[in-house]
From Swiss-Prot:
It comes from Cellvibrio japonicus (strain Ueda107). This is Succinyl-diaminopimelate desuccinylase. It comes from the Bacteria. It catalyses: N-succinyl-(2S,6S)-2,6-diaminopimelate + H2O = (2S,6S)-2,6-diaminopimelate + succinate. The active site is at D75, E140 (proton acceptor). Catalyzes the hydrolysis of N-succinyl-L,L-diaminopimelic acid (SDAP), forming succinate and LL-2,6-diaminopimelate (DAP), an intermediate involved in the bacterial biosynthesis of lysine and meso-diaminopimelic acid, an essential component of bacterial cell walls. One of its GO terms (biological process) is lysine biosynthetic process via diaminopimelate.
C-alpha cells in the first residue's frame, strides 16, 4: 500500500519553491525575491544590497526597540554529478516523509521556517514590540567576502545594531532542536613557505633540503600544547592540511616547501598570541621562511541570557527536548555578527546530510522548526 502523501504546509511549500532555485554559490537564482515578496506582504521594509557578484538583502519590520534578526544564506554548495542523486537535486521531492533536494538542510529549510514563523507571528501580533529583521546573503558557502560581513558593515554605517540574532545553520544532530550553537571557535590559517637550495639527491652537500629543515619545527608545532580550553570550548587545535614540495622528479631536492595549516582556537587565546608563538618556534629552528596569515573569524560565545533562554524555552515547548549548548563545529556567518555586540545563536535542522549527495531533511522537522522560531518571537517580542 502506498503511504499517504505528506501534506504541503506553508513551510514545506516555501521550502520546495526555494530548493527549485539553482542557487549554487554565489548565485541566488531568485531565492531572495521569493522571500522579499513574502516579507513585504506582511509589512517588512527591504533593501537589496549587491556587493560584487553577491546578492544580499536586509529586511526590517517594526518602529523601534530591540531587533531580533534571522540570518541565513540562499546559496548552496555544488551538487557534484547529478546522476549520483536518487532524484534531481533541484527538484524537491518528499519520500517517506523526507524532503530531498540540495539545500533542504543547509539552509533553505531554515529560511522557509523563518519566513512562515514571522508570517504567523505578525498575523497574531501586528503591533508587536521591538523589531524583526532578516539578513540574507548568497555568499556563505563561498569566500564570504561580499556577503554577511559587508551587510554588517553597511548596518554599522547606518548605526543599526542587532540585539539578538538567530542564524539558521543546521545545528541539530539526531533530533531537531537537540543542539544550539551558542558560540564558535576562532579560525586562523597560515601558508608557510620554507626556502632551501635545489640540487641533485646524490649531492646533498651542494643543496639545502627545506623539507628536512622544516620537519623538526613542524613536529614541534604539532606537539605543542596551546591551551587547555575552558568550560565552553575544547583546547585549541593545530592541523596541517597540505604539504607541497618538489619538482615531480625523483632525483631533485626541492628548493622550497609549502605547508598550509589551521588553528581552531578558543577564547583562552588571541590570534596575535598564536602568531607570536608559531613564529617563535619557526625562528628557533632558524628557518628561512615566509608566512602568510588568514584570519577567518574570532571565537565568540553567547552565554545564557535573553536569547539563549528564549530559544531553550521555545525548543522545550515545541519538542519537549532540553537543548544542549555547544560551540563545536566549523565557522559560520555568526562570526561576523557577534563582534557587533549582538547575542548570536545558531539553530536549524539536523545536519547529517549537509553537503552530501541526496541531501534531505524530515518534512515534519521543518514544521517543528517553524514552531520553535515562532515561539522565540513570542517570548522576545509579543
Amino acid at each position: 500500500m502506498t503511504p499517504p502523501a505528506t501534506p504541503l504546509t506553508p513551510t514545506l511549500q516555501l521550502a520546495h519553491d526555494l530548493i527549485r532555485c539553482r542557487s549554487v554559490t554565489p548565485e541566488d537564482d531568485g531565492c531572495q525575491e521569493l522571500m522579499i515578496r513574502r516579507l513585504e506582504a506582511i509589512g517588512f521594509k527591504t533593501e537589496r544590497l549587491r556587493f560584487g557578484e553577491v546578492d544580499n538583502f536586509w529586511a526590517i519590520r517594526g518602529g523601534d526597540g530591540p531587533i531580533l534578526a534571522f540570518a541565513g544564506h540562499t546559496d548552496v554548495v555544488p551538487t557534484g554529478p547529478e546522476t549520483h542523486w536518487n532524484n534531481p537535486p533541484f527538484e524537491p521531492t518528499i519520500i517517506d516523509g523526507m524532503l530531498h533536494g540540495r539545500g533542504a538542510a543547509d539552509m533553505k529549510g531554515s529560511l522557509a521556517s523563518m519566513v512562515v514563523a514571522c508570517e504567523n507571528f505578525v498575523a497574531r501580533h501586528p503591533n508587536h514590540k521591538g523589531r524583526i529583521a532578516f539578513l540574507i546573503t548568497s555568499d556563505e558557502e563561498g569566500p564570504s567576502i561580499n556577503g554577511t560581513v559587508k551587510v554588517v558593515e553597511w548596518l554599522e554605517a547606518r548605526h543599526t545594531k542587532m540585539t539578538w540574532c538567530i542564524v539558521g545553520e543546521p545545528s541539530s544532530t539526531t533530533r531537531v532542536g537537540d543542539v544550539i550553537k551558542n558560540g564558535r571557535r576562532g579560525s586562523l590559517g597560515g601558508v608557510l613557505k620554507v626556502k632551501g637550495i635545489q640540487g641533485h639527491v646524490a649531492y646533498p652537500h651542494l643543496a639545502d633540503n627545506p623539507i628536512h629543515t622544516l620537519a623538526p619545527a613542524l613536529a614541534e608545532l604539532a606537539a605543542e600544547h596551546w591551551d587547555n580550553g575552558n568550560e565552553f570550548f575544547p583546547a585549541t587545535s593545530f592541523q596541517v592540511s597540505n604539504i607541497n614540495g618538489g619538482t615531480g622528479a625523483t632525483n631533485v631536492i626541492p628548493g622550497e616547501v609549502t605547508v598550509v595549516f589551521n588553528f581552531r582556537f578558543s577564547t583562552e587565546l588571541t590570534d596575535a598570541i598564536l602568531r607570536e608563538r608559531t613564529q617563535a618556534i619557526l625562528d628557533k629552528h632558524e628557518l628561512k621562511y615566509e608566512l602568510e596569515w588568514i584570519l577567518s573569524g574570532q571565537p565568540f560565545l553567547t552565554p545564557r541570557g535573553d536569547l539563549v533562554n528564549a530559544v531553550v524555552d521555545a525548543i522545550n515547548t515545541a519538542t519537549g527536548l532540553d537543548a544542549e549548548l555547544s560551540t563545536s563545529g566549523g565557522t559560520s556567518d555568526g562570526r561576523f555578527i557577534a563582534p557587533t555586540g549582538a547575542q548570536v545563536v545558531e539553530l536549524g535542522p539536523i545536519n547529517a546530510t549537509i553537503h552530501k549527495v541526496n541531501e534531505c531533511i524530515s518534512a515534519e522537522d521543518l514544521n517543528k522548526l517553524t514552531a520553535i522560531y515562532e515561539r522565540t518571537l513570542e517570548i522576545l517580542l509579543a
